[in-house]
Amino acid sequence: MIVLDASAVIEWLLQTPTGTRVEERIVSAVPNLHTPHLLDIEVAQVLRRYVAAHIITARRGQEALQDLIDLPLTRYPHDLLLWRIWNLRNALTAYDAAYVALAEALGAPLITCDRKMAAASGHSALIQVV
């Protein structure tokens, strides 16, 4: 069982060198991958920004979005995590805290590319940076 955050998923979807490392880390866990619903919005926003900045084409953005929809992820609503997200407010943004809170609740490692999130204190999640 693994929790994925948006930074790891965007790299995986765009098949970057970092995305290859993400895939190597999670391949044995498929389809036991978990994330808060927030991931979909965060990934869509990054794809939108990359298209606007001409980092990827609109077509590639659409393909990545479809790949996201097709991923075998178990998604969790935020309401179950809100109090823990709030309690992490001094160490993490609410966005990052959603992933950390889910990892804590499931007792699963969190895979991320975000070193700042991984360095935060005040939680019991096992965070693995790719």
Which stretches of residues belong to each language-model region?
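Acidic, PIN/NYN-like endoribonuclease modules and their adjacent C-terminal/linker elements
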Residues: 1, 88, 100-130
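Short, well-structured N-terminal submotif of metal-dependent ribonuclease cores
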Residues: 1-38, 50-59, 63
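Short beta-strand scaffold positions
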Residues: 4, 35, 94-97, 112
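Alpha-helix capping/helix-boundary segments
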Residues: 8-9, 39, 81, 99, ...
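Short, structured loop/turn "capping" segments at alpha-beta junctions
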Residues: 20, 57-58, 74-78, 95-96
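Short active-site oxyanion
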Residues: 30-33, 73, 104-109
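Acidic catalytic patch
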Residues: 39-40, 60-90
